[in-house]
Amino acid sequence: MMSNEKRGEAIDLSHHLSKVGQARQTSPLKSLHKYMGKPGLISLAGGLPNAGYFPFASVSGEILAPDSFPLETGSKDSSLSWFWKLFSRSEKERTSTFTVGKYPKHPGDLNLESGLQYGLATGQPKLNEIIREFVGKVFQPAYSNWTTLVHTGNTDAWSKTVQTILNPGEGLIVSEWTYPSAMASAQPFGVIPVPIGMDSEGMSSISLQKTLAEWDESVRGFPRPRVMYTVPIGQNPTGTTMGIQRKKEIYDICVEYDIIIVEDDPYYFLQQGEYVPKADRVTDAANGDDEVFIASLAPSYLKVDYQGRVIRLDTFSKTVCPGSRLGWFTCNPMFAERLERTAETSSQAPSGFTQLYVASLLLKWQYDGYIRWLKALRLQYKQRRDYFLDCFGEEFHLQKAFSTEGYTAGAHLYYASLKPKRSFVPLSEKDTAYSKPLFSYIAPTSGMFVWLELHLEEHPSFTSLGYKALEMKLWTEIAEAGVLFAPGAMFFATKVEDDTPGPGHFRVSFSNSSPKEMKKAVSTFGTVLRKFMHTRI
């Protein structure tokens, strides 16, 4: 790892600020905070409620031990025993307690007097120290003057970023399949999505280069885009993982065309690796020291960002809890200062309670404890993914084939056809509705989702209805049977019209259901498919 002394500073990228981003000024009242720490100061300037009237004398909580979840799953025969224990809650949880008092016992202690008071958008100093240490050790930015800034979760962080660096009528580079809430957030600001082709690592550097090199403003109607939005790990919805070589390729293209990369990475620590079918699986283990664990993760764009053109969005939503609404930016100081100005007159600092609770958790665990938690968390979600995909293998007949085209190129595809159940319909050897694949997927390598591509060409009403109508009809019947999938059309970067060509898709989550529910959901899906494929609409 190169020392900061040998690394250059971020280049001047202020020309990427939007008109709104340029116009923001320091909140007049917030500008007074620079005097607040002066010894002996009597402040009569701000409308700060008296901390003596806060109705909380202290706050406290119980924290799970960082090693509450195992780093290995045991023998092959009992590989799910820990999984069932997770839902039975038969074993007493090991916890420790923390308490935050109203006033600090020692200088720098967490306390309610300052933690629950109005403050700067930069948040609690102690939490900032923890975050900065974590980023330096884990993400290792490639320039010296990087900084961090807390925010209220990646959704709001992205909204602030859009306002800060994008103007109405400008383009935004995105993957052809992308996170719909990010697009919904940008759309009211008049931002135009520019879809880029994908393969099994996510955004294709070849497609990106081609799109930018061939850009014709007179045809497109707006200038070549200068901002990219990407979810490189656990790509939402496809579940792919982008490696360091692809990131270097894309980063170099962004340097060539002067593009800012917004790296939205909530699933970073849920990198599960390749799926191994149940019959071939051996004991899972996450042993190894902290550096081995960190080295096993696909690096962030920060690792190759020597110019400060990456704005990274991190969140505690997937590693602690989503209700915390807490995360942080990592970016160059110029962007951080502009984002701070945006927060001053909107969300301000994240919730004081949230900051105190999360800071207390991380102080209790320390860096080593948090890394231990993350190691086990990755294994937990890996086992969930494996079990869910195993259920597909039990319910459907699967054929594995290497894909060379489209967003699955470079990965093995699983083609699923129905296993006949004579209790539903008569079956002949030539029944194509059973013998041909009805959907396919690549096993996700990160995140929480499986992305199913539907193959409904053998449906008796396909010629008259087409892909989209059949997709939504099938989705409705699955929902009415008690299982809810996310319709694929909402994840397309641009609006899907009735005549948009191409197969339908479903995004299916394995993150929050019990093993029994997962198995039932896949079985229900199979039952609905059997009936659906033999029903003319």
Report each predicted region and the residues it spans.
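N-terminal "arm"/small-domain region of PLP-dependent enzymes with the aminotransferase-like
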Residues: 2-123, 479-484
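Short beta-strand segments
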Residues: 43-46, 195, 229-232, 262-265, ...
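Short, solvent-exposed loop/turn segments at secondary-structure junctions
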Residues: 47-51, 155-156, 178-180, 201, ...
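Conserved core of the PLP fold type I
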Residues: 68-258, 262, 268-304, 381, ...
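Conserved core segment of the aminotransferase class I/II
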Residues: 86, 98-100, 107, 130, ...
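Conserved glycine-rich beta-strand-loop-beta hairpin in the small C-terminal domain of fold type I
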Residues: 374-378, 382-389, 401-457
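PLP-dependent enzyme catalytic core of the Aspartate aminotransferase-like
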Residues: 480-537
